[in-house]
Amino acid sequence: MKIPHRTTSSLTLLTVLALITSIAAACSAAEHSPGSTSATTTRPASPFDPTEKPPSPIGLLLAYRAIDEIGLVDGTNVVASVSGTFGSSNDLITTEDGKFVFARTTDNKIATLDVESGKGATREVPVGPTLGTGGAGTIMWLEQPNRLMQLDLADPDSQPVLHQTVDLPPAAGGHLREPRLVAARGGTAVIARVEAPPSPFGGPDTLYAVRGPAAPTPLGQADANSPVSVARLSPDGAELTYALYRSTDSSCGTAAVVLSGADGTQQTFEVAGPDADRGSRVPKLWWPVTGPPKLSLVTWRCDRPETSSPLVWQLAGETSDTIEEVSPPTSALQTIDVAPGQRALILPETGGYAEPTGTLVLEESTRRISIKSGVDAIAAIRPSP
């Protein structure tokens, strides 16, 4: 099923970047049968030190974050890992140069894994609640009240340095809340702040794009009464996609997906179905180095706690002007194409969406091989030439 979009005029991220440039020069597991849906537009850890060097990569590697470790997979084998306790999020887990896997521990430290050596460590560096990337082997976070901080993972002795001070414009009404980093990638950081009278559900957010020394540029107010927490920038930082969740009460709400595109418009895809008694949510968004952004979508009946299996969708078309289920229809929290005929998937532990973690499996034809349980995020790493 393809869904057209609702188009409205807005200042898009690409337009913002152009403006700023001018100013500042991812054993067998059971298969799940995908359901159907309809949509309409608009862990401190001891450092991991292997006794011998991991096998040389034979192809694309998979990085993963689980509740108890971050790791690397070659084929179906975990070849390196770092123990820790990790919460689920939509944060990136690999640096832009593909040389490090990283994640924030629940006690606010940073676990890292060197892809080439297989060595890992836990850095005694307090980081912010949301991590992004800042180019090459650096990571980035927001330190209150207005400091974008950066850490170079390639230097084991590095300390956080100030990347940029972000002075958001004043807002009327006295309802300001602390800003939050929503995403950072490709030289762009997106920051959210509640500026209007907040709803009981925490929103709405006003979004800003930050790139270079120029002043942040507003991207507008999110059309939702809940905070924006699931978002992803394109690899070059030129486009942004994020999920909306419009709460109707504590147990229900509906989802939409927004893309700030390259054509001067903002596209909103209303992925909620027409049934007012059904809720929907986007728990995960990812944007591969190549290809369109993808997302997992879950639905449920508002009068029942059970949810359906998450289904994978993607933005499609030459200008990402439609949204559709991937082919073949896939029930998973996240997917990555590994090789022709092979995919890595995070499958829910149960048939429905009960928690944001699942089992990482490698799928080849009709066979699925389990690799690791309790996984909530994966990313592809291509070996350096």
In which residue ranges do the predicted regions lie?
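Bacterial N-terminal signal peptides that target proteins for export
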Residues: K2-L14
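C-terminal motif of bacterial Sec signal peptides marking the signal peptidase cleavage site
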Residues: I23-A26
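Bacterial signal peptide processing site
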Residues: S28-E31
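An edge-strand/N-cap motif at the start of beta-rich repeat modules
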Residues: A39-S83
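Repeated scaffold domains used in trafficking and secretory/extracellular systems
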Residues: P47-E52, F86-G98, V125-T138, P169-R185, ...
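Short beta-strand elements that form the blades of beta-propeller/WD-repeat-like
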Residues: E52-A66, D91-T94, G98-T105, G135-Q144, ...
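Loop/turn-rich, solvent-exposed surfaces of beta-rich toroidal or solenoidal domains
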Residues: R278-G317, V326-P348
